[in-house]
């Protein structure tokens, strides 16, 4: 939980060795990168809004990670965190994002017309398609560190911006605190709303403070374009629909997102972005595009194939269970999405999903007929 600066000064009465966390049983990127030397060097630093090294790492100290799943183990409290604590963040970013170096530049491409295909994924296998990203509003602390006033200001700005959208994007904001339990649960079950903050990662990082104050969901009239306000990021923008038309989902995503960005810019509140990290977000795993383009796809045979994991890796895709992170697949339906966020563009990342899923559906159809797919195994992308 973020503390005031005085608390950090109080800690300096103890030697770095006495304050250094025990990370001996940890499996996360932070624990791998945080040496005693780095801890010594950074522990008395703080960002202009008062975020400290211990605030950055607390979630990773409290959640050692999973023997098979490498979590990130740290968060940013504001835009400056990535600069002030770069000695810790840089190796974590390099490790998490396939060797992305401190000197590398990210690229952005939100021109949906650059996507090839994507309108012909077989709906008998691809049940739904979704693209999401996060955005942070410049000048405000991020959710692990923002005050109640800041969070409410972000909500007010966001609602004003979103309510000015027209046409296919015309919609309405639903604050969490005025929803009944049933309404909330229904939206969660329909995959429209974020879960209640029970995740230890959310809790330990301070993101769940004052819940549900100033949190909510905005969506257009036909629920195909949604914005979450003040969950893990200031904004999470989501375009989704049933079936396999990823081309249309991505078009709506790009157009809606750029409209929102334009409105915020005009109001004097651009999104946090720089040419090294792309869009700046709370979790280092989302830096770059912040984009996750995913489909729910039925792969009853391919998922039992001994090379399933290898095929995903070669296609630069990752799988989750049907309900998202840390859940099991129900009825052989997997949530398959791009593994990369940083160093490649939005179009490139969605292209990998479209091409990879198309290939996997073709493999699935061959396996149904009892045919071999050995000649279809892709090379590493």
Swiss-Prot record:
Pfam families per UniProt: ATP-gua_Ptrans, ATP-gua_PtransN
PTM annotation (Phosphothreonine): residues: 166, 180, 313, 322
Entry's localization field: Cytoplasm
GO molecular function: ATP binding; creatine kinase activity
Any one cellular-component term (Gene Ontology): cytoplasm
Matches recorded under Gene3D superfamilies: ATP:guanido phosphotransferase, N-terminal domain, Glutamine synthetase/guanido kinase, catalytic domain
Binding, ATP: 128-132, 191, 236, 292, 320-325, 335
Family: Belongs to the ATP:guanido phosphotransferase family.
Quaternary structure and partners: Dimer of identical or non-identical chains, which can be either B (brain type) or M (muscle type). With MM being the major form in skeletal muscle and myocardium, MB existing in myocardium, and BB existing in many tissues, especially brain.
UniProt function note: Reversibly catalyzes the transfer of phosphate between ATP and various phosphogens (e.g. creatine phosphate). Creatine kinase isoenzymes play a central role in energy transduction in tissues with large, fluctuating energy demands, such as skeletal muscle, heart, brain and spermatozoa.
Protein name: Creatine kinase M-type
Gene that specifies this protein: CKM
């Amino acid at each position: 939980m973020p503390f005031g600066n005085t608390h950090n000064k109080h800690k300096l009465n103890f030697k770095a060795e006495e304050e250094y966390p025990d990370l001996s049983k940890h499996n996360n990127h932070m624990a791998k990168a945080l040496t005693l030397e780095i801890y010594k060097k950074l522990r008395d630093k703080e960002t202009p809004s008062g975020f400290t090294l211990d605030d950055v790492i607390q979630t990773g100290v409290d959640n050692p990670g999973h023997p098979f799943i490498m979590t990130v183990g740290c968060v940013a409290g504001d835009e400056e965190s990535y600069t002030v604590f770069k000695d810790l963040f840089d190796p974590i970013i390099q490790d998490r994002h396939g060797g992305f170096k401190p000197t590398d530049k990210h690229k952005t491409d939100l021109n949906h017309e650059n996507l090839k295909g994507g309108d012909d994924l077989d709906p008998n296998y691809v049940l739904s398609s979704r693209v999401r990203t996060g955005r942070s509003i410049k000048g405000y602390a991020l959710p692990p560190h923002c005050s109640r006033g800041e969070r409410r200001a972000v909500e007010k700005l966001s609602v004003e911006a979103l309510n000015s959208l027209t046409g296919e994007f015309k919609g309405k904001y639903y604050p969490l605190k005025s929803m009944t339990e049933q309404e909330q649960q229904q939206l969660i079950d329909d995959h429209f709303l974020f879960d209640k903050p029970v995740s230890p990662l959310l809790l330990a990082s301070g993101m769940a403070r004052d819940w549900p104050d100033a949190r909510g969901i905005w969506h257009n009239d036909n629920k195909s374009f949604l914005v979450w306000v003040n969950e893990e990021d200031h904004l999470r923008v989501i375009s989704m629909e049933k079936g396999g038309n990823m081309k249309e989902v991505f078009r709506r995503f790009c157009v809606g997102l750029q409209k929102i960005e334009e409105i915020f810019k005009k109001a004097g509140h651009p999104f946090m972005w720089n040419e090294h990290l792309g869009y700046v977000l709370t979790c280092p795993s989302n830096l770059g595009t912040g984009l996750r383009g995913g489909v729910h796809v039925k792969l009853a045979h391919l998922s039992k194939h001994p090379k399933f994991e290898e095929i995903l890796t070669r296609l630069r895709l990752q799988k989750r269970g049907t309900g998202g992170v840390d859940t099991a697949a129900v009825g052989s339906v997997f949530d398959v999405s791009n593994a990369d966020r940083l160093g490649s563009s939005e179009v490139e990342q969605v292209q990998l999903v479209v091409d990879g899923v198309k290939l996997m559906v073709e493999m699935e159809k061959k396996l149904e007929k009892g045919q071999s797919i050995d000649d279809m195994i892709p090379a590493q992308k």
